[in-house]
From Swiss-Prot:
Protein name: High osmolarity signaling protein SHO1
Transmembrane feature ranges: 37-57, 69-89, 99-119, 127-147
Record-linked InterPro entries: SH3-like_dom_sf, SH3_domain, Sho1_SH3
Subunit structure: Forms homooligomers.
Native source organism of the sequence: Zygosaccharomyces rouxii (strain ATCC 2623 / CBS 732 / NBRC 1130 / NCYC 568 / NRRL Y-229)
Family listed: Belongs to the SHO1 family.
Gene: SHO1
Keyword ATP-binding: no
Residues in the Cytoplasmic compartment per record: 1-36, 90-98, 148-371
Extracellular topological segments: 58-68, 120-126
Keyword set includes GTP-binding: no
Topology class, membrane: Multi-pass membrane protein
Length: 371
């Protein structure tokens, strides 16, 4: 079997791909100091590590039967502590939560193994070393529980609620909501071509009541010809019996008859019969013959919208290409919001672009910034 060779991307193309949809993270200690959980747990870990390393050095200088593998456990714990600090300072914890949880689990095994050897030793030096590794084991267990959980979990949301940066967004929750919304859009875009459903090119039975004052036709215009199959483009295979001209003549005849007051009662008596042939289009709500334009008011761009709230974006967000309702925004951007109910809010950018945004990516601020 001959495999087609895929050309390697050039340096410029690879660099462009790395920068695409990427957030630029800069080093800042404020990212660490603004999170009470990270600051407290890292401080306890650093203090416990100092106690453990001091006790191990003192114990190793006193006796020759000190467990050598404990040195690797202490060094490995310091490496994990250093990496966690770097992740917080660059605000990249959400990208490496799985790695932190797995690496901390390995460190938990190392520390508990060292604790079982040192805790039964005699002397204050071994007691200090055992106390240090026990404290490290406790912190490691807490880290496994926190970093191994999703940001949308109740415990993570409770812990992150005390942070100055607020609750962190959940990638898993956003992906599931995107999938559910995409499925709804696919169902809404389906076209039925059976006996009771017609494509979107079919004329709609709706006209403004203001335009028909005095000339109302209580019966909707419907097609009286035979039900013929549709081709892939949704066009009807016309014949001598179902030409569009006959359909137009029937409509004009109905309008002329409606001008005669004597035919008003007759039209009302035939209304139920005509309603049986009424078809349902894409804009029908399935229960009545009225349009459902108001149902999609959240996604409509027509008309003057009111955006009484002001929000500032906490992170950069790239809209899903498969969802036409989402909009992208940059970190620190000011948006106008019209509705703050639910997980997805309707917002307006300074450029005039309107769409929906995830609520956990923004925070409400005082309305003192002009768009």
């Amino acid at each position: 079997m001959v495999m087609d060779k895929v050309p390697m991307p050039s340096r410029a193309k690879a660099k462009a791909q790395r920068k695409k949809l990427h957030i630029n993270h800069s080093f800042s200690l404020n990212n660490l100091f603004s999170d009470p959980f990270a600051l407290s747990s890292i401080s306890i870990t650093l203090l416990s590590w100092c106690i453990a390393i001091a006790g191990c050095i003192a114990t190793a200088s006193d006796t020759d039967n000190f467990p050598r593998f404990t040195w690797w456990g202490i060094a490995y714990q310091f490496l994990i502590l250093f990496m966690v600090i770097i992740f917080y300072c660059y605000d990249m914890v959400d990208y490496y939560k799985n790695f932190i949880a797995g690496a901390t689990a390995v460190s938990f095994v190392y520390n508990t193994n060292s604790a079982t050897i040192l805790v039964y030793g005699d002397g204050s030096r071994k007691a200090a070393a055992s106390a240090g590794v026990i404290l490290l084991s406790i912190v490691n267990l807490i880290w496994i529980f926190y970093y191994g959980s999703d940001n949308a979990s109740p415990t993570s949301r409770w812990i992150d609620s005390f942070s100055l940066r607020g609750i962190r967004p959940s990638a898993t929750q956003d992906a599931s909501m995107r999938a559910r919304r995409r499925n709804r859009n696919n169902l809404r875009s389906q076209r039925f071509t059976g006996d009771n459903f017609y494509p979107e090119h079919q004329p709609q039975n709706y006209m403004s009541s203001m335009a028909l004052t005095g000339f109302e036709n209580p019966d909707p215009a419907y097609y009286t010809g035979p039900n013929v199959p549709l081709d892939r483009n949704g066009s009807v295979a016309y014949s001598d019996n179902n030409m569009p001209g006959a359909f137009t003549q029937d409509m004009n005849a109905n309008n002329q008859n409606n001008l005669n007051p004597n035919n008003f009662n007759q039209n009302n008596s035939n209304q139920n019969t005509f309603n049986q042939n009424t078809f349902m289009t894409e804009t029908s709500n399935g229960n009545t013959d009225t349009t459902m334009g108001g149902t999609l008011e959240l996604y409509s761009d027509a008309g003057e919208e009111s955006f009484p709230y002001t929000a500032q974006t906490l992170y950069r967000y790239q809209a899903d290409e498969d969802d036409a309702y989402e909009i992208s925004f940059e970190q620190g951007e000011i948006l106008k919001v019209s509705d703050i109910e639910g997980r997805w809010w309707k917002a307006k950018r300074s450029t005039g672009e309107t769409g929906i945004i995830p609520s956990n990516y923004v925070k409400l601020i005082e309305d003192n910034i002009a768009m």
